[in-house]
């Protein structure tokens, strides 16, 4: 027996008889006569079983037909492609521990009959750097470096992988994660005192004054500009609060000093004819109309006319 014979392929055993179904093995007799074949017409030849011949030529090392693979090649190739398509769906789950799919026929990879498959064969002629591995499954998220864009997006966390990616922790990414990063300057006591004194002199220093303060305090000029902006905002808030507090105090003080005695109700014991001593010592007596005589004829004093003055 040939040592290269594949036991899984029946075509590598040409000595075994090819069993045909009984319906095909029985000879059928026909009563009608077959018409003669016309000269020049295309004749139909039934296909022959070339499996044993191809297998024999492949196993015997016939150089003339060496480019004709056996039938086991196509079987192994189909199984390998099926496994490859299953693994391509899990290719981007690089952060998870995915079990690799093993081919049921081990001779497919050991004998070297299958070509080496690239992990990007299922993508086509696209750039392999277009899609980056993502931690949340086969979502096929495009990488920003493929589009040659200066802006970078926030990278997803590494799920299932305890080791951090050092490229994600770079200073470039740390500054771009939050968009525009805000820097906070810590001023010393001397610098704060100097700036407060300058603010008392002028709330809006000019460019020359800010440049002098920057050179004296060893602080960038833009930091001094930001400090004055924040200080003016703080001063305005303080002024608004003080103005509101003063308005509230004046309103509450005026309402407490107001005398509501004039609006007090009359005492129930006081009758309409009650007599109360007043501050002048004159007793209150009921008045009658006879005490006020009505004079119908009154003598008005004569005022000098304008002609006398003239």
UniProtKB/Swiss-Prot annotation:
GO terms for cellular component: axon; cell projection; cytoplasm; nucleus. Residues 281-298 have a biased composition (Polar residues). It is found in: Nucleus; Cell projection, Axon; Cytoplasm. Residues 180-239 bind DNA. Residues 262-310 are annotated as: Disordered. Expressed in the bilateral sensory neurons AWA, AWB, AWC, ASE, FLP and PVD. Also expressed in the enteric intestinal and anal depressor muscles. This is Homeobox protein dsc-1. It comes from Caenorhabditis elegans. The gene is dsc-1.
């Amino acid at each position: 027996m040939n040592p290269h014979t594949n036991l899984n392929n029946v075509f590598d055993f040409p000595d075994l008889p090819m069993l045909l179904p009984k319906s095909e093995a029985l000879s059928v007799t026909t009563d009608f006569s077959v018409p003669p074949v016309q000269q020049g017409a295309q004749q139909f030849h039934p296909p022959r079983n070339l499996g044993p011949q191809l297998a024999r030529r492949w196993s015997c090392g016939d150089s003339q037909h060496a480019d004709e693979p056996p039938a086991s090649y196509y079987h192994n190739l189909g199984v390998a492609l099926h496994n490859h398509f299953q693994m391509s769906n899990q290719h981007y789950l690089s952060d998870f521990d995915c079990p690799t799919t093993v081919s049921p026929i081990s001779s497919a990879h050991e004998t070297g009959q299958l070509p080496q498959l690239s992990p990007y064969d299922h993508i086509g002629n696209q750039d392999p750097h277009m899609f980056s591995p993502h931690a949340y499954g086969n979502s096929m998220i495009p990488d920003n470096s493929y589009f040659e864009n200066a802006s970078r997006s926030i990278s997803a966390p590494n799920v299932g992988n305890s080791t951090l990616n050092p490229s994600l922790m770079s200073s470039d990414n740390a500054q771009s994660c939050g968009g525009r990063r805000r820097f906070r300057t810590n001023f010393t006591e001397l610098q704060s005192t100097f700036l407060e004194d300058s603010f008392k002199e002028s709330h809006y220093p000019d460019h020359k004054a800010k440049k002098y303060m920057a050179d004296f305090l060893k602080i960038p000029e833009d930091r001094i500009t930001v400090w004055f902006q924040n200080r003016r905002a703080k001063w305005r808030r303080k002024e608004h609060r003080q103005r509101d507090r003063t308005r509230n105090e004046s309103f509450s003080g005026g309402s407490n000093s107001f005398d509501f005695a004039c609006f007090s109700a009359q005492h129930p014991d006081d009758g309409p004819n009650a007599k109360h001593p007043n501050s002048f010592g004159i007793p209150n007596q009921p008045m009658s109309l006879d005490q006020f005589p009505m004079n119908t004829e009154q003598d008005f004093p004569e005022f000098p006319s304008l002609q006398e003055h003239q």
